[in-house]
């Protein structure tokens, strides 16, 4: 079994090392990851500049691009064949609710799914961790990767996995919740009197509704959320079909 591992925290992050080490128990692992932290870069793809990949050691490549670039380059350029599985992570910090639209880790799994390769994204709650917590998350990733390998996934579906720090009570199948951010823009003044801004500094407001990824994590459970490539809101069809859609160029 050939497994491609990537992330958005960068090739030197402790999370990807723990993940790759754990997945060696399932098959051959090749790491293709950004050469630096590319967190919150979403599904960005480099189209107007060349990419370079340096092999740091056998089976570990550092790419001067995004996580989505890494998946493309790994599948179409660096690996000897199409991988059987793509695993992204272990992300430093949970990717819950609205986070999935920003996360390079989640979007790496999405990119693999677009290419027809089964995939999962794995994130660990918090910001600083003991090595034992990374190992715990890596063990969970191995368990779920094996399940995906054995059982497969529905068409156009990938898994967003979030692991709580500390004691784990079990695993729950969840739906995407909401993780709303407060005032994300902080305005400052530099010594020359010019304004500058920091993004993403607001407090988070979690949706702890039962059945959501946020609630499962809050209760100490690993959250496994199946995500689909088709973002169509089918429930809105009835409402929108009542709109008058007659349109003329005259």
Swiss-Prot record:
Keyword Manganese on entry: no
Cofactor stoichiometry and binding remark: Binds 1 divalent metal cation per subunit.
A GO molecular-function descriptor: exopolyphosphatase activity
Pfam families to which the protein is assigned, alphabetical: SurE
Main location: cytoplasm
Cross-referenced PANTHER family: 5'-NUCLEOTIDASE SURE (PTHR30457), 5'_3'-NUCLEOTIDASE SURE (PTHR30457:SF12)
Family: Belongs to the SurE nucleotidase family.
Residues binding a divalent metal cation, per UniProt: 8-9, 39, 91
Catalytic reaction annotation: a ribonucleoside 5'-phosphate + H2O = a ribonucleoside + phosphate
Organism: Syntrophotalea carbinolica (strain DSM 2380 / NBRC 103641 / GraBd1) (Pelobacter carbinolicus)
Enzyme Commission number(s) from the entry: 3.1.3.5
Official protein name in the record: 5'-nucleotidase SurE
Job of this protein: Nucleotidase that shows phosphatase activity on nucleoside 5'-monophosphates.
Any one Gene Ontology cellular component term annotated for this protein: cytoplasm
Cofactor: a divalent metal cation
Location within or outside the cell: Cytoplasm
Tagged with keyword Protein biosynthesis: no
Alphabetically ordered keywords of this record: Cytoplasm, Hydrolase, Metal-binding, Nucleotide-binding
Top-level taxon of the source organism: Bacteria
Classification via Gene3D superfamilies: Survival protein SurE-like phosphatase/nucleotidase (3.40.1210.10)
């Amino acid at each position: 079994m050939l497994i491609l591992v990537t992330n958005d925290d960068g090739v030197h992050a402790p999370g990807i090392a723990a993940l790759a080490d754990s997945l060696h128990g399932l098959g051959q692992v090749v790491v293709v990851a950004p050469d630096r932290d590319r967190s919150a870069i979403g599904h960005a793809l480099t189209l107007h500049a060349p990419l370079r990949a340096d092999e740091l050691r056998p089976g570990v490549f550092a790419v001067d691009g995004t996580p989505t670039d890494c998946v493309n380059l790994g599948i179409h350029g660096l690996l000897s064949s199409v991988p059987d599985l793509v695993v992204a992570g272990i992300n430093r910090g949970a990717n819950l609710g609205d986070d999935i639209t920003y996360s390079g880790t989640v979007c790496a799994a999405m990119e693999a799914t677009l290419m027809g390769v089964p995939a999962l994204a794995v994130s660990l709650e918090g910001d600083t961790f003991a090595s034992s917590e990374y190992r715990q998350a890596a063990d969970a990733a191995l368990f779920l990767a094996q399940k995906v390998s054995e059982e497969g996934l529905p068409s156009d579906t990938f898994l967003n996995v979030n692991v709580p720090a500390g004691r784990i009570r079990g695993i729950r199948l969840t739906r995407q919740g909401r993780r709303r951010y407060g005032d994300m823009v902080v305005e400052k003044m530099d010594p020359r009197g010019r304004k500058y801004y920091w993004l993403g500094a607001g407090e988070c407001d979690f949706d702890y509704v039962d059945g959501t990824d946020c609630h499962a994590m809050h209760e100490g459970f690993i959250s496994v959320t199946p995500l689909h490539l088709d973002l169509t809101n089918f429930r809105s069809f009835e409402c929108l079909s009542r709109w008058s859609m007659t349109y003329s160029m005259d």
